[in-house]
Amino acid sequence: AVLSCALTLLAGLAQAQPMPATPSAQAGSQMQAVTPAQVPVAFAAAPLPGGSTRAATLRELGIDYEITLRGVQGSAGVPFSVRSDEIVTAATLNLKYSYSPSLLPDLSHLKVTINGVTVATLPTDKANAGKLLSADLPIDPRLVTDYNQLNLQLIGHYTRDCEDPDHSSLWANVDAATSLSLTTTPLALANNLALLPVPFFDVRDTRRLELPFYFPQRPDTATLQAAGTVASWFGSLAGYRGAVFPASTEALPASGNAVVFATPGTLPAQFATADSGVADIRGPTVAVLANPNDRNGKLLLVLGRNSEDLQRAATALALRAPLTGAVARIGDISAPAPRRPYDAPNWVSSESPVRFGDLVTQPSQLNVTGYHPDLIRVGLQLPPDLFVWERDGIPVALNYRYTLPEQDNKSALNVSINESFVTTLPLTGRPFAQSTPMRWWNSLGTRGSMPVHQDLTLPVGAFSANSQLRFHFFFDRPQGEACKNTFPDVSGAIDADSTIDLSGFHHYMAMPNLAAFANAGYPFTRLADLSESTIVLPNNPGDQDLSNVLTLLGHFGASTGYPALHAQIIGAGAVQQHAGRDLLLLGSAESQPLFKQWRAHLPIGQDGRATRFALTDWLFERLPRFLSFDARRTDLPTTAEIALQPQPDDVLLMGFESPLAAGRSVVAFQTEDPANMSRLFDAWFDPTLLKDFQGSVVVLQQNKVTSLVGNQAYYVGHLPLPTWLRWYFSHHPVWLALTVVLLALLLALAARVLLRRHTAERLNDGGGA
């Protein structure tokens, strides 16, 4: 059985920590250390200055369960990679495992390979069977390349006679606490822009990206916009890893890589010499130079005569203009076409059907082999405001292939969304049909004609902001005669031409909705370049405020997969000029003037209480849902029901309709110390906390997330008038009843007027006669 773990380790490995000196001791008294039966000599060179050792467990990489190896040749694979600017000098696998007491020691063992080369074999003696064991396995660092595959394989036998390859006694478990430790030494890279985004971002590195930004003096809003463009680009590259961008106006980072924004008047003295290549700034310029404080670090310099030049240089970077050499002068840049709503590269298009082949990075991800294959996973990032009312679901045109069983059995293709089951399609060589006429019609076709076409409808309730469509091929082994091999190789595949179609859905959603904001950056990311979004800074923003702005823009870039080329950054005094845009506010109650000016519009006032709690709100909160005039969520507590006492280190995240323009949104971050925002970003990167961001108000207290719903709702998007009327009256039956009564009265009044007129005409005609 083959289990392909869709994970990537790298030289740093996510959530890295120092490798314990005695891993076996950590397991407690019940874990025994095992000496491998075969371990090649590890050629571990001493790390050079600047080297580091890091380790990560399978649990830290997302596998919080035991990996089970089953069958006579059960295996599991974990790919890992090494950064371009690091070289591995030593590697160790601390394997924690157990195995079946039924395994024959002289015929069975566990094999560990790196890139197909065996590095260790572990015995399965009877004395240690069924126990949790630990083994430290040195790995020859010469075997470790850029991209690597760690495989664990069980060679298992329970009898010397004919055996069932799937017998229940053939198993071995690999504990999620198993860890891989890599000692790395920095590798010098040339100062060459052609390597970008390396070393500032390396796709091989699965850790969260932390890239400092340095401004030689306090940046104006135009310079910060240029920096935001670059931050959003790096955020789009980081994707699921997440990214934070510490900002500094004090000094260059003491170590590592960083991005620097400067003009001739602010260029650091280290680069003002002629041999630097950047001393004479005559226009938009991008350069890569060594960090003068760290011989292993690099600086990405974005330079220009003024803020306009800086924006042009930042745009060239974000649009991946071809650059080479240590220094590049940016010429004319053709402006990219304006983005259309919902056309973000990372989002499933709602304009036309989307091929599955466009939703995976490699075609091989749609293929599996073996009797116990891994899942086929297709990522689906849907627009948050899809209007799914009265829709059966999302249509999928599925084409799939598989090894046809010789006769009908229990083989099937199971379809699910995240953890929610959708349907089972028997692998009979024909499309599946539930109705008798369709089954009869399908039986007329040729059995085994591939690909099999199946129209599916995916239930919308199972989808989340970042969903995963999963396909599991289950192949039922045929039963053969004793000692006769009747187990041919089997495989299954989802055709890349299979499609998912959102083109029939409108975009309409009740707001505020902080779940859509936290997960997808909505409504700001409705346009991928953020051309209708404005960030409002607090008064006298400090370094932490600058970092928060850059990290937010990086978060938006990760959602859309596109840089925020047209996001605007302003002070509170200029907000009136941006009335027709969605606004994002930052600051404290004192540093952000708009919190005081718009106090009447905030869902939570300065004393932590609701500010718009009226008799109608009290009444509607107590009406049954089907009688309510309001369409807000009723599954969350309201701000009027919560006694909230914000503390200085709390973070308030609020959503409300813009006081400047109907239908426009405001999302506000309020905290006394801008450094508290780092805890909110950490919560976004934690799936267990991210799901708690809901409603119109989120309160982050230490590591606890509390979501509240405000007393007012507004809507964004558009519906055709007939659809809107049907939807509105279905949610507001009281208004429907009143409308019906009003129409009846109007009809009665019209009928009365007509009848009286008709009567008068008859009387006049009769009198004339």
Name these PLM-found stretches:
Residues 2-12:
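Bacterial N-terminal signal peptides
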Residues 17-769:
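Solvent-exposed alpha-helical segments and adjacent loops
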